[in-house]
């Protein structure tokens, strides 16, 4: 209570107070904005001065610091966000996506791994909880001991830390027009998005989720959704829910047509959501913590930030890639069955003897993530087919303050008939999450 009475006015005087302030600010932001993907950022970087100050004064030991960090992690997991059942079911409960990252390069290009980096890893060992969503940055000159510490934590089965490769992430940010010094200071947002702490806008992802597996399913059925019977974009003039593709090139062109159609719609939905959020959910407290917001006299949702970079949440690129490869290989190259036979097998959910034979062939087809170049290339093609669309998309905040304002790519599940099947081949079973292999 003594700390709470003074520390926000005079600033943190100790490592303990610094952790308290970090946690309080985190909680206030969650309360203001319904608690989704508010992240601690580069905790080991901005807390290092207080840690070293207290160690030098003799008022803190490494063991004390570990206890404080561990307690902060436990307190973070005491928070909750009530979600719809659909989200709870497919997101393993009630995740908050409160990302905390350690390690990696500093803005000056030097390695930033320090004692706090290791203490945070040890704290996650002790907690063994799903939150904070723990990440680690690494690069070619990262200390081997740091990479090994991360590997040992991953080996426990907790699934963390998520590993972010600096050379790759920094190059991606530079390609968006982010200055190198800021790009080197990036941190993960929520799960896999990257951004510049204290300078990014109000969200890293779009307000829409586009299930690419569903897009492929609709494409294969000539614009019909087989679950509802609704038809949105006919590919041919035929009323039949089937397209008799003659070769892979025709199939690929159809994919690009449908991807653009649904991506365009999702950007329009984003704009509708953004216009409402700017009026009804301004986030004044969070806006005060972002550079240029006060200078521009705008909230985050009006463009009060340095960089306004958002992405779509695109579900299942590997599902699409695996499916396209299976069709390319088994229908067009090996001619083991026809497109019509494949769709018939999916419609009866692989239950008949003939369908099970087709399913067996589909399951044996190469899958993304197994170092098989032909299918991996098709998955890469799927990614690039979306990247080619992004230059046409703008946010509502472009030209209203941010120095960089654009769309980029992100990659989240329910699809019925998609011919990628390994364990996932049947209707209403789960597909892979996000951009993960099946």
Predicted regions and their residues:
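Conserved catalytic cores of very large enzyme subunits
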Residues: 1-432, 436
């Amino acid at each position: 209570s003594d700390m709470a009475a003074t520390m926000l006015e005079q600033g943190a005087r100790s490592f303990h107070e610094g952790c308290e302030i970090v946690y309080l600010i985190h909680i206030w932001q969650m309360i203001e904005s319904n608690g989704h993907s508010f992240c601690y950022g580069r905790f080991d970087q901005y807390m290092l001065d207080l840690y070293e100050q207290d160690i030098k004064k003799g008022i803190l030991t490494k063991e004390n610091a570990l206890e404080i960090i561990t307690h902060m992690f436990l307190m973070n997991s005491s928070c909750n966000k009530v979600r719809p059942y659909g989200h709870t079911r497919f997101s393993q409960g009630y995740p908050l996506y409160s990302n905390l990252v350690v390690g990696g390069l500093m803005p000056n290009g030097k390695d930033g791994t320090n004692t706090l980096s290791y203490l945070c890893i040890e704290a996650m060992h002790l907690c063994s909880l799903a939150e904070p969503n723990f990440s680690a940055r690494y690069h070619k000159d990262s200390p081997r001991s740091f990479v090994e510490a991360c590997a040992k934590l991953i080996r426990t089965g907790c699934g963390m830390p998520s590993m972010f490769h600096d050379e790759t992430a920094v190059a991606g940010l530079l390609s968006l027009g982010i200055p190198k010094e800021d790009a080197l200071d990036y941190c993960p947002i929520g799960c896999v998005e990257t951004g510049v702490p204290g300078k990014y806008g109000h969200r890293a992802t779009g307000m829409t989720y586009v299930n690419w597996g569903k897009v492929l399913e609709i494409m294969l059925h000539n614009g019909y959704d087989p679950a509802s019977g609704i038809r949105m974009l006919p590919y041919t003039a035929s009323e039949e829910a089937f397209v008799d593709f003659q070769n892979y090139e025709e199939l690929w062109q159809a994919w690009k047509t449908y991807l653009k159609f649904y991506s365009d719609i999702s950007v329009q939905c984003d704009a509708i959501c953004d216009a409402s959020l700017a009026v009804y959910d301004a986030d004044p407290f969070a806006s005060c913590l972002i550079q240029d917001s006060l200078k521009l006299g705008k909230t985050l949702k009006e463009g009060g930030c340095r960089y306004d970079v958002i992405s779509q949440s695109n579900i299942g690129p590997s599902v699409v890639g695996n499916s396209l490869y299976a069709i390319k290989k088994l229908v067009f190259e090996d001619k083991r069955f026809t497109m019509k036979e494949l769709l018939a097998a999916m419609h009866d959910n692989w239950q008949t003897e003939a369908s099970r034979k087709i399913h067996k062939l589909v399951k044996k087809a190469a899958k993304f993530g197994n170092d098989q170049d032909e299918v991996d290339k098709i998955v890469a093609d799927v990614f690039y087919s979306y990247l080619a669309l992004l230059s046409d998309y703008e946010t509502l905040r472009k030209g209203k303050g941010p120095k960089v304002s654009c769309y980029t790519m992100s990659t989240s599940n329910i699809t019925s008939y998609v011919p990628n099947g390994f364990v996932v081949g049947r209707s209403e079973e789960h597909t892979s999450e996000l951009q993960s292999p099946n």
